[in-house]
Amino acid sequence: MLLTQFQAEIAQLPPTQHQFLIGFSGGLDSTALLLLFAKLREKQPHLMLRAIHIHHGLSANADAWVTHCQQICQQVAIPLIVEQVKIDQHKGIEAGAREARYQAIRQHLLPNEMFATAHHQQDQTETFFLALKRGSGLAGLGAMQRKSTLYCLPICRPLLTFTRQMLLDYVKQAGCPWVEDESNTDSRYERNFLRHEVLPRLRQRWPHFDNAVQRSAQHCFEQQQLLNELLHAEFAQHFDKTERTFQLRDFATRSQLKQNALLRLWLAQCGLSMPSKVQLTQLIQDVILAKSDSQPQFQLGEYCVRRYQDTLYLTPHFADLSSLRLPIHIGETLTLPDHLGTLSLQQQAGQLQVIWSHPQHTFTSILPLTEDPIEVRFRYSGKVRLSPTSANKDIKKLWQQHAVPVWLRQRIPLIFYADRFKSAVGYFNAI
């Protein structure tokens, strides 16, 4: 019966969705999810399953949990990835652990895989109450959906309609052991406080309380979807789907309410969690309304919202590369820092071909051969002469002519012959 219901949930996903990465802590809920996927694979052999266990290092039992998860996954023939993470406790243990967890998962998720979590009906109620406590709007009160994007990860939650008791009965019947995380009883954590001290009394008073909360969450989600639909035409005027940027042209003519809604819709399209009202107001004041010649940015979780001219960009936090000087020789390939790809120098037809293989594009520059030492740098603030007949130009003007945003200028490899600037690879060369 439970497997039939689970199969129906998976059937609601796109028909081409056959690959799943299962979040597996070893606890009751994720054990039920793992077993259900393993059983479903017997009926649907085309399913490609992997599991991932995140070692947070917060419990003395963490190593034992890894061993347990490895044994269970071996029994059901599902490959297991174990990833140990470091938690930034300045963000709080709960928030820091969640962010570290999803960062690790994102590194392992394959292009056609979907991350599957074991959230069930009682988890949904807790999520709704936590959103209520934060003063969330429709998007937050919509709680968790069967399929969504979080931290830029495609996620499915096929157990949302299942109660914890159903999962408990299923795992017991399967005779499969699970682990208990001792922190789950610590009511200092908000979710545990709700789970142990608040919600049991409500369920005792109203036995169908979880069903009612789930209906309310669904109503909120549907109202938010309707609002997004009504905003679609105006949003399309601002959103560049390819670059995931937000154009500010005519933005100031919108009402404050509509400005907030359009920005939230943009951030949601980019897979970010919703900012608070205070954060949204600060984003508008510090970035959108900043002087046109400034370099405004606003930190939002793992990302930065930046503005260049009349466009908002969403970028990761970048490392400071300004002091780097990387030697390179002809015939070599250099791995560039901070996920910028590789750069190679090849001698070709009496010239030097510089190839920058960036994860998104490939850039090429052709330079004269030299016997001088060659370096790759990421910062230069002097003058550039493009041809024998042209005047020296400030490099800042050249970046502006190529419409390169300020923060990207220090992420483009610059070629130097000794101390002479020769090329911004893929953009312009000096004589």
Curated annotation (Swiss-Prot):
EC numbers: 6.3.4.19
GO cellular component: cytoplasm
GO molecular function: ATP binding; tRNA(Ile)-lysidine synthase activity
One GO-annotated biological process of the protein: tRNA modification
Gene3D superfamilies membership: 1.20.59.20, HUPs
SUPFAM superfamilies: Adenine nucleotide alpha hydrolases-like (SSF52402), MesJ substrate recognition domain-like (SSF82829), PheT/TilS domain (SSF56037)
Cited Pfam families: ATP_bind_3, TilS, TilS_C
Chief localization: cytoplasm
Domains as described in the record: The N-terminal region contains the highly conserved SGGXDS motif, predicted to be a P-loop motif involved in ATP binding.
Name of the protein in its database record: tRNA(Ile)-lysidine synthase
